[in-house]
Amino acid sequence: MRNSLLISLAAAALAEGKAYSPPAYPAPWASGAGEWAQAHDRAVEFVSQLTLAEKINLTTGVGWEGGQCVGNTGSIPRLGFRSLCMQDSPLGVRDTDYNTAFPAGVNVAATWDLDLAYRRGVAMAEEHRGKGVDVQLGPVAGPLGRAPEGGRNWEGFAPDPVLTGQMMASTIEGMQDTGVIACAKHYIGNEQEHFRQGSQENYTVADAISSNIDDVTLHELYLWPFADAVRAGVGSVMCSYNQLNNSYSCGNSYSLNHILKGELDFQGFVMTDWGAQHSGVGDALAGADMDMPGDVAFDSGTAFWGTNLTIAVLNGTVPEWRIDDMAVRIMSAFYKVGRDRTQVPINFASWTLDTYGNEYYYAGEGYKEINQHVDVRGDHAKVVREIGSASIVLLKNVDGALPLTGSERFVAVFGEDAGSNPDGVNGCSDRNCDNGTLAMGWGSGTANFPYLVTPEQAIQAEVLKNGGIFTAITDSGATNTTATTVAAQASACLVFANADSGEGYITVDGNVGDLVLHTVGPVLVEDWVNHPNITAVLWAGLPGEQSGNSLVDVLYGSVNPGGKTPFTWGKQRSDWGTDIIYEPNNGDGAPQQDFTEGIFIDYRHFDKYNITPTYEFGYGLSYSTFSFSNLQVTPLAASPYKPATGHSGPAPVLGKVLNATAYLFPNYIKRIEAFIYPWLNSTDLRTSSGDPNYGWSTSKYVPDGAQDGSPQPVNPAGGAPGGNPALYDPVAEIRVTVKNTGKVAGVEVPQLYVSLGGPSDAPKVLRGFGRLSLGAGEEAQWTATLTRRDVSNWDTVSQNWVVSNYTKTVYVGNSSRNLPLQQTLALKIGH
């Protein structure tokens, strides 16, 4: 009765469009759906051999600095199974050497090139694989980019679910085709850094920020790219630090059990972000499968899981089938990508670059060779350079100021952003400074530079090759008089600025010049971008180690710029309509971030309120020109959409749990300080737990249905990884002719937008894109396919996707504001 009432109340709240996460239990167990079947069967066979302690070792990290990687599970020596290695980052192998520093995700999005995204995924995975990494902690779809101030937006792709989703899928496919497990992160609503873990700086709050997101916005915006990741077969998903609707993401049963594992039929494992776990039993029942890094607080030696998870299974609080499912999900991902074939020993250490050191870094034990300095770079500099040049966006080019001809006699470069970091290329830990040119952001999503070709170095080399002379003023303290004198003498001036500094240099007078921006996202340029002395503006983003070479390729015309901005550039800060929280807004309780803008972020907001941007989403110039013509929209017959039906089988139980004596700490193992183990210290479970509340009735903290392993109904919106298979039925084919009307070969990015037509819908949303290379005068036909999902809305009442009766319109062009072709879409979808 109580359970039925709760379900009814939850359904009512969702139907009313409230930001609410109702409880959803039990955690769905993996079935081996779709392409997971063979890997799942192998995982079941493997897990069936394990003891309870060995299963716990798979699910629990050994603690911060308890192994050579940033995250390490326990091992299973009896079966020759070593610890699994989790390692950052989304743009290369973090905390090592002889690795490549790849362009950031935002640059990949600016290419609008799925092949480049795939190739970058392959190259990054080759390097992680070569270092012995099992799980690369990327790519990123959270943050999506709700507000331009989001500190980690650059790690992801774009504030658009389709562009991000397709980039996610291609990156994941590249990584996993190469034999490394990808990790889609940070799930979900992780849209700011302030208060993501609660208290910070001068503010004390009880809990992490809550992202309060209604059901429509969650499905149509923030969940969309994660669905693409699941459909692409991603092996792991990382739950985030923040709360979703006032429930911690790693313990939110609605987002993990109901949506991710139910609706999206995710077959892999959910990994916590480092320190994002807030309970033991609760998170296990809510759908978390692996705890990282394993300890409650770094180097504390205490754990929510480990011994405590062993106890919870022994006393029946966590059912046997749940721990079995956790282990099966982890091993399914392992086998799916072929780690049993591609795994090599871990040959680096995250905590030091010294050749010899302690394997157990915090404990200071296990002295051995920990860094073999394996060079994993191969020829990856080529793809770095290619992505760097392909992602450059030409924002302004007056009277053909670019490309440079190479005949300029005197080229001058201005700005700290053009030069080297005086403290060395890796002089700041995790790149946590802004000295010299900006080629990646900072934080855990970084990698060490093996070198960094600065713009100053690359431009000087080009100028000298052409017989010119060159000077660079990269000291931000240089006098304006000095800069003015040099500028007046130069044939061409190139001014460099980044997101943090450098705008003062654009006031240099006496010569026309070009401006290059290295930024993590949009910046306000309206005050100066139309200055007559600024003849060209390039956005180069965060291009990685080949920064200068990629830029020179475009500056001198060996590469015709084809990048399109993956975000909108507003004229003033208020244009975006969203912001992050800088100060607590809920007393000492969890800060509350209400996503009241709904689906209207970035260009959707600008369009809804008729705000004119400086540069719109999808905008980018070329050294050539292009035309669009002959739009053809062909509806395709599609069967009626049928909600998924039926039931799962019962939760499988693999092996047999013995009594507590079987799980006592082995006397042949030496304890390592602060290392997290699965074993008991006593056969008395209360004593072994050390928990003063041990023995409470499960009714006090175990939700209704959480322990139920009986057959469960299939989620009607589910049925296969990524959601109901009918969502991906093609419903229309779009064809358009694109012609290069200029005098040089170039690249154009056709973009397909759709208006869903409803009063609550955005004026238009991106639904497809391509990248065409065309010679001068050449034309080609570009084709795109719309799926049922592309023309559907999330219905909160039926809790499923529906195609509305509103008139739908197709638009094609080369930016969100330049769409010369449009046509009404007459669907042939059965009912």
Located regions from the model:
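Short beta-strand elements
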Residues: 818-831
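Fungal secretory targeting signals
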Residues: 1-18
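Glycoside hydrolase catalytic-domain context in secreted enzymes
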Residues: 14-704, 708, 715, 721-793, ...
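A glycine-anchored, Pro-Gly-centered beta-turn/N-cap motif
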Residues: 799, 804-806
